[in-house]
């Protein structure tokens, strides 16, 4: 099944994507991100991450560099938004 999903993404990237104007606001592109996520985490987790990325790929989000995470999580982790609590003296 993994090969079928990866071949489908390849087909999209080679035959469909070039016929449409570039729209992805992220690096790597959503198709590259999904391909890498499927390779790294398997079909279901990879497609889940790809879907989560795809729904964020719109003008309401900033975009930019957004690599496949090192570890899989069902929850969204915002990078660089970790808060450190200070002790009050």
UniProtKB/Swiss-Prot annotation:
Transmembrane segments: none annotated. InterPro entries: Membr_insert_effic_factor_YidD (IPR002696). One of its GO terms (cellular component) is plasma membrane. Keywords: Cell inner membrane, Cell membrane, Membrane. It is a peripheral membrane protein. It is found in: Cell inner membrane. It comes from the Bacteria. SMART domains: Haemolytic. Could be involved in insertion of integral membrane proteins into the membrane. Belongs to the UPF0161 family. This is Putative membrane protein insertion efficiency factor.
